[in-house]
């Protein structure tokens, strides 16, 4: 397990919980079997499964997959997202959310993933991606690029900051829970909305729509924090 995810694995579900807008957005695009790429502990997949959908999850982190299977009772496999072409099934919806896509470290790898998503989708199937809108960060002429709002509840506080690191962005987190405080860093590949749309088009996707969140807010390149994209294989 990577150091970053190992450090937050025990508190992951305290930090990140599904929300209704997210679930509704996915269910509106669900057509047949669903694949959750980078499913983590499987909370989102479980919500969809509880609503009657046939869902499979994959994640690179074995500890997450164990929780997805044993605690959230979903069909999950420990697998790199670049290996989805090895799955037997095709899908009506593939989604990769939670800024997971940008853990791939190059345009080439992201392009490879999108191509494999296209190949694994049924005709009229949908792909949903959600990452951070990196455009505002890339306009900052400083090593410190900014932060996202702190996640804070009765169980945990999760502080998120971003720093320039060559061609990458260093994602710095501090998680405080009970009697522990853990700081960690991981590099992210800051692909922009324009670059992502271009790759989707090159791989044959159509009906590409960009939003500023799962609430379908209009995407503002300069100000939107999330970037949500849906695309269809016609």
Where in this protein do the model-derived segments appear?
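Conserved class I S-adenosyl-L-methionine
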Residues: 1-32, 43
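Conserved S-adenosyl-L-methionine
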Residues: 38
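Class I SAM-dependent methyltransferase SAM/SAH-binding core
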Residues: 42-84
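A short acidic, Gly/Pro-enriched loop at the edge of an enzyme's catalytic core
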Residues: 85-93
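A short SAM/SAH-binding and catalytic strip from SAM-dependent methyltransferases
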Residues: 92-108
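A short glycine-rich, Lys/Arg-flanked "PGG" loop and its adjoining helix->strand segment in the class I
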Residues: 111-123
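SAM-dependent methyltransferase
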Residues: 128-199
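C-terminal lobe and adjacent flexible extensions of AdoMet/dcAdoMet transferase-like proteins
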Residues: 193-234
């Amino acid at each position: 397990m990577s150091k970053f995810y190992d450090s937050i694995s025990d508190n992951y579900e305290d930090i990140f919980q599904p929300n209704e807008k997210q679930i509704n957005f996915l269910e509106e695009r669900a057509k047949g079997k669903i694949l959750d790429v980078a499913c983590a502990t499987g909370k989102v997949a479980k919500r969809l499964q509880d609503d009657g959908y046939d869902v499979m999850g994959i994640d690179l982190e074995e500890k997450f997959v164990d929780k997805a299977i044993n605690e959230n009772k979903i069909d999950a496999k420990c697998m790199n997202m670049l290996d989805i072409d090895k799955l037997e099934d095709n899908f009506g919806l593939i989604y990769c959310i939670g800024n997971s896509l940008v853990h791939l470290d190059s345009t080439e790898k992201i392009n490879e993933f999108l191509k494999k998503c296209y190949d694994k989708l049924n005709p009229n199937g949908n792909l949903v991606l959600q990452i951070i809108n990196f455009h505002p960060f890339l306009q900052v002429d400083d090593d410190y690029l900014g932060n996202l709002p702190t996640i804070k509840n009765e169980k945990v506080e999760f502080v998120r900051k971003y720093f320039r690191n060559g061609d990458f962005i260093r994602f710095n987190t501090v998680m405080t829970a009970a009697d522990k405080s853990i700081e960690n860093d991981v590099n992210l590949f800051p692909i922009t909305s324009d670059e992502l749309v271009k790759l989707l088009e090159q791989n044959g996707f159509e009906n590409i729509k960009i939003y500023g969140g799962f609430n379908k807010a209009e995407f503002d390149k300069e100000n939107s924090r999330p970037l949500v994209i849906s695309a269809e294989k016609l």
